[in-house]
Amino acid sequence: MRILYIHGLDSRPNPERISSLESNGHQVFALHLDYRTEPSSYLKLKQYAKGEQVEFIVGSSLGGLMGFWLGEELGLPCLLFNPAVYFGRENANIQLENRIGCPRRWVVIGEKDEVVDPQISYQYFEDIAPQSQAQRVIRCQWLGHQIDPDTFREVQRWVGL
């Protein structure tokens, strides 16, 4: 499967996560973005996803917010870790051309997240798709903002990646 991995704010693509996905036979694409100086990051990701014919999105924090909207706009399934939904579409300069809708979404929320308020994230996803079969929200009591390798691999396995 062709996967786009999107890192968070002030971060970079995580080689361990990319390697974990690749070890299962996936082709992983990842851009290093400086969201603070590149206001067109979303557009760049969208063009890249289309050009590489991406089939699945994995995103973390601000990358999770970008991944959420890419999934909605391009009709791609996604796995989102602590998506920074509080940041908002407008603040991230996300312009939608159309909205096909995400066919399948997994959202992992760390209950000990010290950066992204887990309750705001949980409520956001409950409000947009209450009891939807197309969305699974996983609340991890032990998880902070950083995703440890064991949790990443376990969720990856659970999702089927």
Provide a role label for each language-model segment.
Residues 1-52:
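Active-site catalytic motif of lipid deacylating hydrolases and related acyltransferases
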Residues 39, 139-151:
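Catalytic histidine-centered segment of alpha/beta-hydrolase-like enzymes
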Residues 56-58, 78:
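Conserved alpha/beta-hydrolase fold motif
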Residues 58-67:
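Gly/Ala-rich beta-loop-alpha elbow adjacent to hydrolase catalytic centers
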Residues 101-102, 106-109, 113:
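Short beta-strand/loop motif that positions the catalytic acidic residue
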